[in-house]
Amino acid sequence: MQLKTMPKKKPLSAGRAPLFLFLCQMISALDVPLDPKLLDDLVQPPTITQQSPKDYIIDPRENIVIQCEAKGKPPPSFSWTRNGTHFDIDKDPLVTMKPGSGTLVINIMSEGKAETYEGVYQCTARNERGAAVSNNIVVRPSRSPLWTKERLEPIILRSGQSLVLPCRPPIGLPPAIIFWMDNSFQRLPQSERVSQGLNGDLYFSNVLPEDTREDYICYARFNHTQTIQQKQPISLKVISVDELNDTIAANLSDTEFYGAKSSKERPPTFLTPEGNESHKEELRGNVLSLECIAEGLPTPVIYWIKEDGTLPVNRTFYRNFKKTLQIIHVSEADSGNYQCIAKNALGAVHHTISVTVKAAPYWIVAPHNLVLSPGENGTLICRANGNPKPRISWLTNGVPVEIALDDPSRKIDGDTIMFSNVQESSSAVYQCNASNKYGYLLANAFVNVLAEPPRILTSANTLYQVIANRPALLDCAFFGSPMPTIEWFKGTKGSALHEDIYVLHDNGTLEIPVAQKDSTGTYTCVARNKLGMAKNEVHLEIKDPTRFIKQPGYAVVQRGSKVSFECKVKHDHTLIPTILWLKDNGELPNDERFSVDKDHLVVSDVKDEDGGTYTCAANTTLDSVSASAVLRVVAPTPTPAPIYDVPNPPFDLELTNQLDKSVQLTWTPGDDNNSPITKFIIEYEDAMHEAGLWRHQAEVSGTQTTAQLKLSPYVNYSFRVMAENSIGRSVPSEASEQYLTKAAEPDQNPTAVEGLGTEPDNLVITWKPLNGFQSNGPGLQYKVSWRQKDGDDEWTSVVVANVSKYIVSGTPTFVPYLIKVQALNDVGFAPEPAAVMGHSGEDLPMVAPGNVRVSVVNSTLAEAHWDPVPPKSVRGHLQGYRIYYWKAQSSSKRNRRHIEKKILTFQGSKTHGMLPGLQPYSHYVLNVRVVNGKGEGPASADRGFHTPEGVPSAPSSLKIVNPTLDSLTLEWDPPSHPNGILTEYILKYQPINSTHELGPLVDLKIPANKTRWTLKNLNFSTRYKFYFYAQTSVGSGSQITEEAITTVDEGKKAGILPPDVGAGKAMASRQVDIATQGWFIGLMCAVALLILILLIVCFIRRNKGGKYPVKEKEDAHADPEIQPMKEDDGTFGEYSDAEDHKPLKKGSRTPSDRTVKKEDSDDSLVDYGEGVNGQFNEDGSFIGQYSGKKEKEPAEGNESSEAPSPVNAMNSFV
């Protein structure tokens, strides 16, 4: 992947890219490098930097100054031509040239006339690399001629006639500005009826009697000479026919009045311009002004349109009551026919103005300075346009190229000069002249052939801070000839950056479009050309963006209540945000009801005008966020007006007896509102240091109206007073007048002075600076003094600005210093401060503790001892000793897991310490290190020790499996921490009867290598509690307990336990011995009697020839664990010895709540007992046994055993 390079807007046309492109990016418009000192020795042809305008009109009453400034290396010399010939300034004593400049000063104020120096001037700036020339500067003195004397006859008109009052000002230079006023210098009012034309004449569409006056005066203002000329006043009288007296009516005819227009209503006609058509020519870029003024009665209205087009919306303006159409910045596209239409109630008239837009020359591509290295190619382009098209001509060093010295590296092709294989002799200044009949353009562009090794102009070690996920731009402004190539590297040994995440701009800037945290680091810019190499390092830090944690929310509150807006932000810890609250995008009202703390804006006693949008803006030096919320104020629920209230604020505050350090304040109390004033609180504002912040000054009794206040120097005091009664405190009074006390020397020094090094070779002196109030005068500074405590050195002092830290470099490591910080200002010093002691920077300790030894206290506790290190080797404040200890692992275990080290730190100079929590029967290793404020020193040699045996932990698990009628099997896992060699296991158990009483305890010792044991000869259906623990030679460990129940007899085994209890799960239950219950004995007797009756009935039916050989079939399907009942005596069969100890199926365990898995017996009583449909045929034989039915739902058991069903009991006999 290659580093992306941003494309240039316009590629170069020939050869390698010349240096002028990057020079334009790093050099100002005048080609001055960003760092002039860096390029002081760079040879450069002249460049005109300042000159007078082409048409230079001067004030003939002042000295003539014709500017010509230029720069170059070496500095250029200057010469002038006047009217095309050399102007020898040495021959004219009135003409001087400013030193180091080409500016001419012609002293006509002492003698001489400005008209003598009219002419066309041109300046030439020349050095060894070429010559630059200025524009042709036409110098003309301004003129403001007087009006010619004339006699103006009074004008008499009938009402309604039109009128034009001519101005015809004298021709001046520049043209005068015309306006009409009366003899009181008040401008004459203008309207759609009366207005001034572009030529200065005053036009009346129709006259009215109120136009009668004798002082219509035209004024011409000549701005250049700041003079005003005036025409003779014109008298106008407007009369109506009704006003004519008999004499006038008899002696004058209608045509003898001024003008022949009728005073009756008439359609419009144009006063200007004349005729139906006219032509207007204007230059490109100027303001096109078209005018149409009409007369008529009633007054006509003017409209404007453009034929075959529309008027440009953003450039069209109407002036003079729409009588003038103006189009700014006209171009050739504005040419065409424009029509003005004058209309009144009697008709309309129109006039067409044909507009042609011509153009003086203007640049398409102006030539730019060209910097090349020897052997390179380059191009100068000079392209201009105009109407008519301008002619392009070239000059070199002010001489037309046709007659200039020939240069083999130069080839001219119209508006382009091409250079190939340039040499230092090719350096010159070229002038391009583009001209037509309307004007000319002249541009200087130099060709400078240089051979310079690369130089980087960006400051070294510049730090850039950027918010994450935003672009980062790292500058590398460079210079060199030939143009250097630029490469960027990250880190001190990184490779060149060639990844897509970077963009390299032509000016050397490295852009990271989306900077991330891992973009942080040092970047190196390297510039190379064939003459050498230069590099520069910059640093980039990526900061977390500022974001809201809590934003203000919409609120609706009642008038008079309080509302709070919360605004919390999370920001980068290195940036300090400022929170600004705004109301309706403006500042908060200057009202104490608005209070702002760190995260909240609180508005108390809300008023209707408080409604609006409140914005919280959080700003850091790198980013900002804002959030807004709307507050709506509603009417409150009516409440009774209070009888009592806080006092009204005091007023009429006055300062008297004004001294340097005291003043007397007097005031007039406000109304106490039916509750006596108990005290007055006086606050002050320091407008100089803490404007807008009011602080407590004093309190006086409620009966006083004056207070003598102590003042501090150099404080601009304002005071205000609040009154307080039992209801509360009044609002503050209006502020008093300000009183500025005189400055004095500080009367206190900074506090919290400390000296603490941050590096081994420095001492950082910090203090809490004085605030502005404490400064006592302007120019607050601090005198910082220090010297070694144990040396004979003199105090070293430095005066620093109003800061809070000073760093002393080059100090020895951890040496005590005496430090003083004294305040001073422009008036003097504060009292001599007391010295405090500090230390230069710490370094890591040099020596490890020696003679480390360990004594074992018991199996879990040991004590370590060591010898202290020499104090000088600590190289800092001794914070203590740190012990690292860990349990040694075998090589196989070390490979499987990381060794966990434990750390204990013993403060101060202790040389021993206890190591608790050790594991018995283990091998441990430890080492000791000394600790200071910088960190840890080297570790001592590892020391090993063994802990003796201890008692083991409890067995990891204990399970009761395979319960039978008289046995239980225990399985367990050894202790997780044997803490020695296990010698045996101890098992204790005891039965629990139905009343939860414990029976006799049985002890049993089991060999240590066993993990399974079977207990025999237990009571059936009995709960047992087990206690189990391991032993070492030291003693017994913690025990684990469990409970389990042996199984019940076969009748009870057949499904009386709840189905949700898994086999073999040992659990506690509340067991009731039902065998001793009276109801159970009675039930058993009833069941026995019922069984006997059924046996007799069955026997009789069998003797009569029953349908099925029941006995044989039932014997074939009988449960293998149950013996059939004897036929001869009718009693139940007993369990055999073999079956008493017959193990359960593999993996089965009988739970303590006596649930038996259904697959253990197909003849489960639950299938046929009470609550289940009977499964017998008409002769009582068991049908289910032959139907193959296996899946029966087990019944839920309870805490007492159920009596067996007589039907199921019958199944066991046959």
From Swiss-Prot:
GO cellular component: axon; axon initial segment; extracellular region; glutamatergic synapse; node of Ranvier; plasma membrane; postsynaptic density membrane; postsynaptic membrane
Known glycosylation sites: 83, 223, 245, 251, 276, 314, 377, 433, 507, 619, 716, 802, 858, 993, 1009, 1019
PROSITE patterns from the UniProt entry: FN3, IG_LIKE, IG_MHC
Source taxon at top rank: Eukaryota
Compartments it resides in: Cell membrane; Cell projection, Axon; Secreted
Phosphothreonine carried by residues: 1131
Disulfide bonds: 68-123, 167-218, 292-340, 382-432, 476-525, 567-616
Secretion signal, residue range per the UniProt entry: 1-29
Pfam families: Bravo_FIGEY (PF13882), fn3 (PF00041), I-set (PF07679), Ig_3 (PF13927)
Biased composition (Polar residues): 1198-1214
Role description: Cell adhesion protein that is required for normal responses to cell-cell contacts in brain and in the peripheral nervous system. Plays a role in neurite outgrowth in response to contactin binding. Plays a role in mediating cell-cell contacts between Schwann cells and axons. Plays a role in the formation and maintenance of the nodes of Ranvier on myelinated axons. Nodes of Ranvier contain clustered sodium channels that are crucial for the saltatory propagation of action potentials along myelinated axons. During development, nodes of Ranvier are formed by the fusion of two heminodes.
Biological-process GO terms, alphabetical: angiogenesis; axon guidance; cell adhesion; cell-cell adhesion; central nervous system development; clustering of voltage-gated sodium channels; dendrite self-avoidance; homophilic cell adhesion via plasma membrane adhesion molecules
Biased composition, class Basic and acidic residues, residue ranges: 1109-1129, 1151-1160
Residue(s) carrying Phosphotyrosine: 1135
Extracellular side: 30-1077
Tissue specificity: Detected in cerebellum Purkinje cells. Detected on nodes of Ranvier and unmyelinated axons in sciatic nerve (at protein level).
Region (Disordered) residue spans: 1109-1214
Ranges where the Ig-like C2-type domain occurs: 46-134, 141-235, 267-356, 361-448, 454-541, 545-626
The protein's name in its UniProt record: Neuronal cell adhesion molecule
Quaternary assembly: Constituent of a NFASC/NRCAM/ankyrin-G complex. Detected in a complex with CNTN1 and PTPRB. Interacts with MYOC. Interacts with GLDN.
Cytoplasmic side: 1101-1214
